Swiss-Prot record:
This is Ig kappa-b5 chain C region. It comes from Oryctolagus cuniculus. Residues 5-99 form the Ig-like domain. Disulfide bonds join C26-C85. Keywords: Disulfide bond, Immunoglobulin domain. The lineage of its organism: Eukaryota, Metazoa, Chordata, Craniata, Vertebrata.
Length: 103
């Protein structure tokens, strides 16, 4: 069985909210190369403004650490509420999200 990755999502830092653009970061540990990362905003898939990078393979278990960064204009960020990062791997997926109004 494939191990599920550990996924964390980080909302924009308060200092960023004073600038023109904000970033949301999704980090996955124990990530296998065949996995996929998708972003949703208010339940709708998002495909722009995303930059994903992997660290070198861990020789112990053949997994990677993955970082996916979503960059948005502040006005766009403020006009939506729920931000979701989904890491799918094998038969399972891990979803992390946050609501802007709860931050």
């Amino acid at each position: 069985a494939t191990l599920a990755p550990t996924v964390l999502i980080f909302p924009p830092a308060p200092a960023q909210l004073a600038t023109g653009a904000v970033t949301i970061v999704c980090v996955a540990n124990k990530y296998f190369p065949d996995g996929t990362v998708t972003w949703e905003v208010d339940g709708k898939p998002l495909t722009t403004g995303i930059e994903t990078s992997k660290t070198p393979q861990n020789s112990d278990d053949c997994t990677y650490n993955l970082s996916s960064t979503l960059t948005l204009q502040k006005s766009n960020y403020n006009s939506h509420n729920e931000y979701t990062c989904q890491v799918a791997q094998g038969a399972g997926s891990v979803v992390q999200s946050f609501s802007r109004k709860n931050c």
